[in-house]
């Protein structure tokens, strides 16, 4: 089901293949098809939920979902080994150039939005943080290496050292945080604990009093604390939420994408249309992300 052309296009809800989702959510009958879907760890849980629910919609289509990171998914798309790549960051210019060499046209489909939350140990007294302070913590040349640099006395953290928990560099979350917080031309400080998965970040912060980490809001739990985030010193402090991701009030929110190799057709198009339908968008909302529009879901 892999197609090949040569330019990049952006696809909106109605423009994803040129028609709206079927009102009854039922795709046309086809022979047995397996769609390969790979990429973002942020999206993997909701992608698995979509795949499971879609079995009831069309038993003739199976969706094989794997993670590995946004970069891994996009690389697989460009190599022609997946039908859909999941990404929590935009495709890079160099990836587009490689796509052209491979005769592939990556088409972007925004399937939801995510608030990138900051996670702290539950005993951390820090209730709010600015984007500039996050940069001081994570960026090369940043001035915050100890909690006392932020005016914080951290219980259980005798060293006072800020333990920076981050993601591996094939992660879309890593790339988005670098773009939104560290800024153009900046680099991460050396010495962070770079983990494979979103849940891994939250789990380590939960167990480490000195730690700070970042991950998708959907991975939050009652054992960690999330400070509100201020765009600058004068801005309102906004807690991470699906609503803040939708209206743009939360400073570090991002779109979540699926990429296809060319305009989707057949079973791929029917599946994406269903994801963008109210049923599919209610599923992403139920998983802690923000849908692309207001949808009415069951009680």
Task: Name each model-derived stretch.
Residues 1-14:
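Sec-dependent bacterial lipoprotein signal peptides
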Residues 16-114, 119-299:
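Exported/periplasmic ABC-transporter solute-binding proteins
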């Amino acid at each position: 089901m892999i197609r090949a052309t040569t330019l990049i296009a952006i696809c909106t809800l109605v423009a994803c293949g040129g028609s709206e989702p079927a009102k009854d959510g039922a795709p046309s009958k086809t022979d047995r098809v397996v769609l390969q879907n790979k990429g973002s760890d942020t999206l993997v849980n909701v992608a698995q939920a979509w795949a499971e629910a879609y079995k009831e919609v069309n038993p003739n289509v199976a969706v094989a979902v794997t993670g590995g990171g946004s970069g891994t998914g996009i690389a697989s798309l460009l190599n022609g080994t997946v039908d859909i790549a999941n990404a929590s960051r935009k495709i890079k210019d160099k990836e587009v150039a490689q796509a052209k060499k491979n005769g592939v046209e990556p088409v972007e489909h925004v399937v939801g939005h995510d608030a990138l939350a900051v996670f702290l140990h539950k005993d951390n007294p820090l209730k709010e943080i600015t984007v500039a302070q996050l940069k001081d913590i994570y960026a090369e040349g940043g001035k915050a290496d100890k909690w006392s640099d932020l005016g914080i006395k951290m219980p259980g953290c005798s060293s006072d050292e800020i333990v920076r928990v981050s993601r591996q560099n094939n992660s879309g979350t890593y790339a988005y945080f670098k773009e939104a917080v560290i800024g153009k031309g900046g680099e991460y400080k050396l010495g962070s604990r770079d983990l494979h998965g979103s849940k891994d970040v939250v789990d380590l912060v939960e167990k480490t009093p000195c730690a700070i980490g970042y991950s998708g809001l959907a991975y939050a739990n009652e054992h960690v604390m999330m400070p509100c985030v201020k765009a600058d010193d004068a801005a309102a402090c906004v807690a991470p939420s699906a609503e803040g991701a939708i209206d743009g009030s939360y400073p570090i929110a991002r779109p979540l994408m699926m990429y296809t190799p060319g305009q989707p057709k057949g079973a791929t198009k029917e599946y994406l249309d269903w994801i963008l339908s109210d049923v599919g968008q209610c599923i992403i909302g139920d998983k802690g992300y923000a849908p692309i529009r207001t949808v009415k879901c069951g009680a």
